[in-house]
Amino acid sequence: MPVVTMRQLLDSGVHFGHQTRRWNPKMKRFIFTERNGIYIIDLQQSLSYIDRAYEFVKATVAHGGTVLFVGTKKQAQEAIAEQATRVGQPYVNQRWLGGMLTNFQTVAKRIQRMKELEEIDFDDVAGSAYTKKELLLLKRELTKLESNLGGIRNLTKAPSVLWIVDTKKEHLAVDEAKKLNIPVVAILDTNCDPDEVDFPIPGNDDAIRSVNLLTRVVADAVAEGLIARNNRGSGTTEAPEEPLAEWERELLEGSKAEEAAAAAPAENAEAPAAPAAEAPAAAEAPAEDAK
């Protein structure tokens, strides 16, 4: 069963790009045509890139990774918070603070400050050690901290992957991820730079329905990864520690090929007595994998 169908992409308007005068020439290979001054994105490519990103996110989470959902534009705020919360992942949907990743120690102190303020009973003025004015100021501080840091309150270290809606608006997040070699999975509209993203998904990053659909797909990948992680943890083998970013990149590209190569000699060794009868079947297996 496909991760998402062509009909779903069409109904959500994923194929609509920006006006032809607002584009990045590097996105030319992802553009299908132009209609009424608007670029139309090639959804066949989008489907392929969605599958690739889905498998990567699922594999990363299955091996103990964390996905940080990022989208501060109005069209993305609700979907980012809803889908990230659904699968228990951190998110930023109000404002990206400079140094949120590269200076995480300072951010962690602000998160701790937020948790300390949450312990205060702002309604009990008489039993508090603060004056009414001080409580009001502390309440305002808490509200601001919750707005900026509430989505990452349980984040204890840099995430394994970033899911980003609109890489142009979230350029600070993209830059910090690059410095730390954290892979970026993102929607690529026709005005974006594909060189900034490790796992691009060509699509509309402005329409609410498009953002909702693609963010839900990424959250579904996280959910599958969590299930696989739990299944692995309940078995005899322990799940490995959170992988490094470079290892995560290699995981999606190389694991399937290695498994297929290791399985072929084992099958041949088990049935040496009937080479003639099983030769056609052995020859067909690689062809099916190639599809």
Curated annotation (Swiss-Prot):
Ribosomal protein is among the record's keywords: yes
Gene3D superfamilies in alphabetical order: Glucose-6-phosphate isomerase like protein, domain 1 (3.40.50.10490), Helix hairpin bin (1.10.287.610)
Basic and acidic residues bias (residue ranges): 246-259
Region (Disordered): 231-291
TM annotation in the entry: none
GO molecular function: structural constituent of ribosome
GO CC annotation: cytosolic small ribosomal subunit
HAMAP family the UniProt entry points to: Ribosomal_uS2_B
This protein's name: Small ribosomal subunit protein uS2
